A protein has these predicted regions:
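Histidine-rich, glycine-flanked metal-binding segment
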Residues: 1-5, 10-53
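Di-metal (Zn2+ and/or Mg2+/Mn2+) metal-binding site signature of metallo-dependent hydrolases
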Residues: 48-72
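Hydrophobic faces of well-ordered beta-strands that scaffold small-molecule active sites
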Residues: 53-61, 83-85, 113-117, 149-152, ...
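Divalent-metal coordination cores built from histidine and acidic residues
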Residues: 72-177, 243
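Glycine-enriched alpha-helix->loop->beta-strand junction motifs that scaffold or abut catalytic
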Residues: 80, 146-147, 194-202, 217-223, ...
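Histidine/acidic-residue-rich catalytic or RNA/ligand-binding cores of hydrolases
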Residues: 96-99, 162, 189-196, 232-245, ...
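Divalent metal-binding pocket/active-site signature
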Residues: 152-210, 226-230
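His/Asp/Glu-enriched, well-ordered alpha-helical/loop segment
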Residues: 239-315
């Protein structure tokens, strides 16, 4: 018998983009069944919606001006249960000391905080910064299970022109079995092909649908950015349908504290997508299953047997 059964739930099925009515059986921290179940403890949801915990696949926590525990307090009530952060802002100022600070202050939180290592400190060789992080310095961090890969590769032209310092960072990342995030605004044609061939899996810099479609057709995951500074969702609304939505995810990139308080986090992006015409189940999928698949989270991102009981309950999609 299950430890807990959530009765009469309307489940957002991110595999079929449907809303299913069923019970959810949970034992320990795992979902063990979806259907008709009884358990030691039962909670009647009376038709409320159950979604997987929301994932922000690209954010700089520093832009919130909050340390780890305070950031958790800001986003967890909005249904965010995991974030993937690139600490390049603090690393450009404080180097490894800043990176270590971010890793340490996000340990043992209810919010799962994963990291992509800052790839460009400084952003280019023309930049000046408070630190320089080379491949040798970053290499030991790939042994940390919370480190998922190499963050946005901002020096796109250095990558295309085979800068040995950049290629070594990519090589270290891929040899560790991790992934590489992209940052290549308006890169196109042969340069884009070369950039992706270097091993860059995703991009969050698309500002128009033509750019997004070119990158999508070449195999990249597209991160649809809607945060405090950059707002690209409206221009990219054609991606909120199959076959595109299964490889596109919602991210914030930067979210200032006032915006977190006033409008929320990824939940705000879902609501906006729905207002702009997206199917609610599709919008939820793009903030759950797709980022989970991109980053290799095997037990996150869906309400299904074998997945973590990492769930949120909402009355409606509008509020």
């Amino acid at each position: 018998m299950a430890d807990l059964v959530l009765k009469n739930a309307r489940i957002v099925n991110v595999f079929t983009d449907e809303i299913d009515t069923a019970d959810i059986a949970i034992s320990g921290n795992s979902i063990v069944g979806v259907g008709t179940y009884h358990g030691r403890k039962e909670v009647d949801l009376h038709g409320k919606y159950v979604c997987p915990g929301l994932i922000d696949g690209h954010i700089h926590i520093e832009s919130s001006m909050l340390c780890g525990p305070a950031f958790e307090q800001a986003v967890l009530p909005h249904g965010t249960t995991a974030v993937v952060t690139d600490p390049h802002e603090i690393s450009n100022v404080a180097g490894l000391e800043g990176l270590d600070f971010m890793l340490e202050t996000t340990k043992n939180l209810t919010l799962s905080v994963y990291f992509m290592l800052p790839s460009c400190v400084p952003a280019t060789d023309l930049d000046e910064s408070g630190a320089v992080l080379n491949a040798e310095q970053l290499r030991p961090y790939y042994g940390d299970p919370r480190v998922l890969g190499l963050a946005e590769l901002m020096n796109a032209y250095g990558t295309v022109r085979c800068d040995p310092k950049i290629l070594q960072k990519i090589r270290d990342c891929t040899e560790a079995g991790k992934i590489v995030d992209g940052h290549a605004p308006l890169l196109s044609d042969k340069d884009l092909n070369a950039y992706i061939a270097a091993g860059v899996q995703s991009d969050h810099e698309c500002s128009n649908i033509e750019e997004a479609m070119e990158k999508f057709r070449l195999g990249q995951y597209i991160m649809i950015r809607e945060g405090t500074a950059a707002k690209n969702m409206e221009a990219l609304m054609p991606l909120f349908r199959e076959p595109y939505c299964s490889r596109c995810m919602l991210v914030t990139d930067d979210k200032h504290p006032g915006d977190l308080l006033d409008s929320g986090h990824i939940d705000s992006n879902i609501r906006k997508a729905i207002r702009l015409g997206a199917d609610p189940a599709v919008a939820v999928k793009m903030a759950t299953l797709v980022p989970a698949q991109n980053f290799g989270f095997k037990q996150r991102g869906a309400v299904a047997p074998g997945y973590a009981a990492d769930l949120i309950v909402v009355s409606d999609f509008e509020s």
